[in-house]
From Swiss-Prot:
The chain crosses the membrane at residues 280-300. This is Mitochondrial escape protein 2. SUPFAM superfamilies: RNA-binding domain, RBD (SSF54928). Its main location: mitochondrion. The keyword ATP-binding does not apply. GO terms for cellular component: mitochondrial inner membrane. Belongs to the YME2 family. It comes from Candida albicans (strain SC5314 / ATCC MYA-2876) (Yeast). Keywords: Coiled coil, Membrane, Mitochondrion, Mitochondrion inner membrane, mRNA processing, RNA-binding, Transit peptide, Transmembrane, Transmembrane helix. GO terms for biological process: mitochondrial genome maintenance; mRNA processing.
Length: 867
């Protein structure tokens, strides 16, 4: 009974029975249109937003006649505003015909007088003209029945449409428009929440429910004095309600409804909790950014690392093996061969007729191809000749790699001994199986980086790590500082350079592993293809990946770590050598790659021992070339046949390649051999004076601070003989058997002053590090002024050591006297003091002799050591 009363109250009254004081929303719009459109010819709904309706016309709303349904998806809402490429079949005329087909059959006099599509809302307003003798309610009910019947027939036409209907139920529906619709194209996208504003008396919650329930399920109604909110279960129902009821006049013209969509602001409890607490939000944001970086950029960087490894040694000779190059090059070579053959034939015929010879012209033309007195072909031949002595070592290196058993190889040798050329050109470059997957890392460049960004860029360049964003380090530091000021704790956004470098090497490990996995996959596919053509009893067994890598060493990349040292040139980068050693040992232990270390620093072997304990390294020691090879090399480059003038000059250079090349350049620049060698010896002597004998020299980070007197003693001993026994050297008061002495000698070896030779791991002999330094030692000692300076300093250092010893003995003697009754110890200490005092007297006499000496120094001895 109550519902009937509400329905009777909400029934739209006919305008003819409205008393004059009552106000109609539609009448107001008509008046506004007449007043504003006096000069306009276009009064359609698209121009005014209002649909005019006359007698015998009904206005209906068809929902869901477009393919895109409006939903809570924001992207789909925006797409509904545009004409998509595949929506050309849904133009206005075709949609109008679709609506007519859905509504048919109708009376013959019925027709569509106006069609207003709403692309955004996926519906359309359709104005029908119906016969006068047919009631409007009956006409509308007939259209609804026809739409339902026609759509049901279409759904049942095949199983696909039926299944689609069961899942989505996107069947068009027809609603009668009760109000005055406002057709707008504002950016007010459909929403299941409607705002109902009352112009006049408000409606109760029950009245709103009766009015809106026919369009769909309602979740909630929030009534108000001037505005009410209705929450529909679906957006489709809200769209239909908004278009059919807005502008509706109720209660005898006392109430007019204005309806609009209201965007629903949904709040997630978890998101709100995180966003409202900075201590939680910032770490979560950082984690999301890190995840994004890993998912997006790490695969790209991994690909670039793979590309660098696979194409690092790509030469023109390898490029010529490409079949595409052969397709182009072979025809070109054939045509040029025909041309040159024709030219040679014509030239030979001319020579037979004229009797002339082109030998002199050929000689002159060949001379034009010589660069600095040497042709390119000669350079190649001479280089091969120079490396004949190391041929066996090169074969040994290749054999170790092909054996594929603990391929952790160390190539040792002094600076300038050609370690890099030996490995890359003569060992790996000469074998087609080994030169296809090579990664070369210049460790010295990593150690020389002065700033964090420079270090990261250098490491990325060495590994092929791209892209790299160094600017994020600066930004992250500022953000971290600001967050620490706000929250009292660090955000963790900024990473230390150690962590960043470690992550880069970890990604390189993944890239290397992927290369080996790809090689294994190729092997598996090839075996499977062969097995398809074989019988079951003849099929080949597919090896496991570890077995495959063990039997195919060429499938693993070769990592060459050039110029490896135990310490970096910049102290802040000292973490790099152990990091590289651990990374390389991991590659070998996981059977992922072959690793070759090239080092001139013998002390770096300790780091490698720590990184790969319980393993015996395979090492190759490269020494200087022999005298005969050096002589032949220089003579071939300089085109000299008489070696008598060079023998004396080449002897100080030994077989050090860098010094030989420097000697050749000096001679080519116009110096005589004697001038060239004298100048090189003078420069080496100046280097020794400045760097090793200068007490004010600034030492590198981690280097043991040697004493100039220690260097002076070693120089005097090595100037007279080729090697020094370590057991004899430690007899000097300046050296003693201790860890400090070994560190000093190792540091001197690092800077190439000396070379240490070990026997079964124990230091045995000491020799000159660079052959040219031996002549430089003699040059310094032969200079009387320099000799007197350093000899006096050397003797003074010995005197100070003896004086310190006497002072220590005197302190002990004083303590003994207080104890008493230890006459034996007193006599022993007294004799020690007397012996040291006698040494001081002898040293002071030697110092006086040195100061008064005016000629060449004679050979003297101290403690049986010649100097």
């Amino acid at each position: 009974m109550i519902i009937r009363t509400l329905r009777s109250q909400l029934r739209l009254p006919k305008p003819v029975y409205i008393s004059p004081p009552c106000r109609y929303y539609s009448t107001d719009l008509e008046k506004l249109k007449k007043e504003s459109d006096t000069t306009e010819s276009d009064n359609s709904a698209s121009a005014t937003g209002v649909i005019d309706k006359t007698h015998n016309e009904v206005l209906l709303y068809y929902d869901h006649i477009y393919p895109f349904t409006t939903s809570r998806n924001v992207v789909k809402q925006y797409l509904s505003r545009f004409s998509l490429p595949w929506s050309t079949a849904y133009d206005d005329e075709k949609l109008k015909q679709k609506v007519w087909d859905l509504s048919s059959p109708l009376e013959t006099t019925a027709k569509i007088t106006e069609f207003v599509p709403l692309r955004r809302d996926c519906g359309a307003f359709v104005k029908f003209k119906y016969p006068p003798e047919v009631p409007a309610t009956k006409f509308i009910e007939e259209i609804r029945e026809n739409v339902e019947k026609n759509e049901q027939e279409r759904v049942n036409s095949n199983i696909l449409t039926k299944l689609y209907h069961q899942i989505w139920r996107n069947v068009p529906k027809v609603y009668s428009v009760k109000g005055t619709p406002w057709i707008e194209d504002l950016r007010r996208f459909p929403s299941p929440k409607l705002s109902v504003k009352f112009e006049g008396d408000p409606l109760t919650e029950e009245e709103l429910y009766v009015l809106f329930r026919r369009y769909g399920l309602i979740n909630e109604i929030e009534p108000g004095a001037t505005e009410a909110f209705i929450y529909f279960h679906s957006t489709r129902a809200a769209i239909s309600a908004k278009h059919c009821i807005t502008g509706m006049v109720l209660n005898g013209g006392k109430t007019t409804l204005h309806i609009q969509f209201v965007a629903i602001k949904r709040s997630n409890f978890l998101v709100s909790l995180i966003s409202n607490h900075t201590k939680i939000a910032i770490p979560v944001l950082i984690a999301l950014l890190a995840t994004f970086a890993v998912l997006i950029f790490d695969p790209i960087r991994e690909w670039f690392i793979e590309y660098k490894i696979l194409h690092n040694r790509k030469s023109f000779d390898q490029f010529k093996e490409s079949r595409w190059f052969k397709y182009l090059y072979i025809p070109y070579r054939t045509i040029t061969g025909w041309v040159y053959s024709s030219y040679d034939y014509i030239d030979s015929q001319i020579q037979e007729v004229t009797g002339s010879s082109c030998s002199e012209e050929d000689d002159s033309s060949n001379g034009s191809n010589i660069v600095d007195g040497q042709s390119v072909r000669d350079l190649k031949n001479e280089s091969n000749m120079f490396w004949i002595e190391r041929y066996e070592k090169s074969k040994q290196l290749q054999l170790w790699i092909m054996e594929n058993a603990n391929t952790f190889i160390i190539v040792k040798g002094p600076q300038g001994s050609g370690k890099e050329e030996f490995v890359l050109e003569h060992s790996l470059g000469s074998d087609e199986r080994l030169n296809k997957k090579v990664l070369v890392l210049e460790c010295d460049q990593l150690g020389k980086a002065r700033s964090d960004n420079n270090l990261i860029n250098t490491t990325a360049s060495q590994l092929g790590y791209f892209p790299v964003f160094t600017w994020t380090n600066t930004v992250s530091r500022f953000v971290d500082l600001g967050v620490q000021g706000l929250t009292g704790q660090k955000s963790g956004l900024s990473e230390s350079k150690e962590t960043q470098i470690k992550n880069m090497f970890s990604l390189a490990t993944q890239a290397i592993r992927k290369i080996t996995t790809n090689e294994y996959n190729k092997y598996v596919k090839s075996v499977e293809r062969r097995n398809k053509r074989l019988k079951d009893d003849e099929k080949i067994e597919v090896l496991k990946e570890e077995q495959f890598l063990q039997q195919h060493p060429e499938a693993k990349p070769i990592i060459v770590l050039n110029k490896y040292s135990r310490r970096a040139d910049v102290s802040s980068n000292d973490f790099i050598p152990p990091l590289v050693a651990d990374w390389a040992s991991g590659l070998v232990q996981n059977n992922t790659a072959h690793v070759i270390f090239l080092t001139a620093d013998v002390g770096s072997l300790q780091l490698l021992n720590d990184a790969l304990p319980n393993q015996v390294f395979k090492d190759i020691s490269l020494s200087d070339a022999s005298m005969s090879s050096s002589r032949q090399y220089v003579c071939d480059v300089l085109k000299v046949k008489d070696t008598s003038t060079l023998d004396e000059c080449l002897e100080p250079l030994g077989g050090r390649m860098l010094d030989l090349q420097s000697f050749i350049r000096r001679i080519k620049s116009g110096e005589s051999p004697q001038q060239a060698i004298n100048e090189m010896i003078s420069q080496a002597a100046e280097l020794i004076n400045t760097f090793f004998l200068n007490s004010h020299h600034k030492f590198g980070a981690g280097d043991s601070n040697w004493d100039p007197s220690q260097v002076w003693l070693i120089m005097k001993l090595l100037s007279e003989c080729d090697t020094i026994n370590y057991s004899e050297l430690v007899k000097s008061p300046l050296f003693k058997v201790s860890k400090e002495t070994l560190e000093i000698l190792t540091t001197l070896e690092k800077y190439d002053l000396i070379s240490l030779k070990r026997d079964k791991g124990v230091l045995d002999k000491i020799s000159t590090g660079r052959p040219l330094f031996k002549a430089a030692f003699a040059n310094i000692i032969s200079d009387l002024r320099i000799w007197k300076l350093y000899e006096t300093e050397y003797i003074g250092r010995l005197i100070s050591l003896e004086a310190a010893k006497i002072q220590k003995l005197e302190e002990e003697l004083e303590k003994i006297y207080k104890i008493g009754k230890v006459d034996g110890r007193i006599d022993y200490v007294s004799q020690k003091i007397e012996a040291s005092n006698k040494k001081i007297l002898d040293l002071e006499k030697q110092a006086a002799d040195v100061a008064s000496y005016t000629g060449k120094p004679d050979g003297k001895s101290f403690l049986g050591i010649k100097f």
